[in-house]
Amino acid sequence: MNELDSLVESAQQLFAQAQTPADLENAKAQFLGKSGKVTELMKGMAQLSVEEKKSRGAAINVAKQGIEAALTARRKALADAELQAHLKAEVLDVTLPGRRRGQGGLHPVSLTLERIEGIFGSMGFDVAEGPEIESDWFNFTALNTPEDHPARSMHDTFYVEGGTEQAPNLLRTHTSPMQVRHAVQHVKKYRERLDAGQGMPEIRVIAPGRTYRVDSDATHSPMFHQCEGLWIGENVSFKDLKVVFTDFCKTFFESDDLVLRFRPSFFPFTEPSAEIDIQFQSGPLAGRWLEVAGSGQVHPNVVRNMGLDPEKYIGFAFGMGPDRLTMLRYGVNDLRLFFDGDIRFLSQFR
């Protein structure tokens, strides 16, 4: 083994002994640094002849390449060892139980709304949607509510910016405006047929959604839900209202022995009008009459505001509170519990 082979072997051994990158750099300096052994060998060629320089320089370069290869290999080995140590320090114990992820669910009122839509959908009713910021015309005027009606007072209605003094904007106080909007669009769609005396398909729609009134106690909230229904055609009677709503209540409460009664009442948008009460024959509420909805035959002025002839088209409307239906179905006495955001309470209804 000549001098250069011994030099390469010596470098390999020294590099292998280095335990850290810093140790390796110190070992490198002994061979490849400014005063390293390879550098000294290169300097020693100054006294050689041209031919000797060629052969000696080539041999030194081969040795230098061997040293650099050993240096690169050791650098990689140290980097791999450092990575493995780092990964080992951060290893996860997969046998530990994971953190429990809470499972969400629909709000009980949302469940009620879905149930209402499903029942009326099976009877052929569409579902209407509309803006919660409504115009005075759709909310009151179109529904035959006179200008001096108490409901128009700021004590009962939230008025908002926008609109005009003659037609202010407000947070809708019921979902009836959605019925009018739906009916107006329906009539517009079939206007040519109506003008030709060919008639139109019946208007059969429910309008569920949020409504707002200045009211707050155990059974009332400033924001509450309503679902109103409308059926207009050429031969729709109060009898149809009784059949439809009776079927709905029995299906919703899953009770065939449920009893309904219609009490005479007054609403500006229906004539005649009736409050609807139900009576359970069994359970904790058995024997009590519970008010669940208002209803009546659609007033001729409202039919006229929909763009129809009240002499030819007639129908019924009803309005109920999904919040109250939810209270009755689950036996909850305080409406505010549904909107306090208490997960412990709401999770019972999943």
Curated annotation (Swiss-Prot):
UniProt KW keywords: Aminoacyl-tRNA synthetase, ATP-binding, Cytoplasm, Ligase, Magnesium, Metal-binding, Nucleotide-binding, Protein biosynthesis
NCBIfam families for this protein: pheS (TIGR00468)
Taxonomy, superkingdom: Bacteria
Family, per entry: Belongs to the class-II aminoacyl-tRNA synthetase family. Phe-tRNA synthetase alpha subunit type 1 subfamily.
Species per Swiss-Prot/TrEMBL record: Delftia acidovorans (strain DSM 14801 / SPH-1)
EC number: 6.1.1.20
Principal EC category: ligase
Cofactor note text: Binds 2 magnesium ions per tetramer.
Gene Ontology cellular component list: cytoplasm
Record note on quaternary structure: Tetramer of two alpha and two beta subunits.
Subcellular location: Cytoplasm
Short name of one Pfam family: tRNA-synt_2d
GO MF entry, a single one: ATP binding
Taxonomic placement: Bacteria, Pseudomonadati, Pseudomonadota, Betaproteobacteria, Burkholderiales
Example of a GO biological process term: phenylalanyl-tRNA aminoacylation
Cofactor names: Mg(2+)
Chain positions recorded as Mg(2+) binding sites: E271
SUPFAM superfamilies referenced in this protein's UniProt entry, alphabetically: Class II aaRS and biotin synthetases, tRNA-binding arm
Official protein name in the record: Phenylalanine--tRNA ligase alpha subunit
Coarse class of the protein's main subcellular location: cytoplasm
Reaction it catalyzes: tRNA(Phe) + L-phenylalanine + ATP = L-phenylalanyl-tRNA(Phe) + AMP + diphosphate + H(+)
TM segment ranges: none
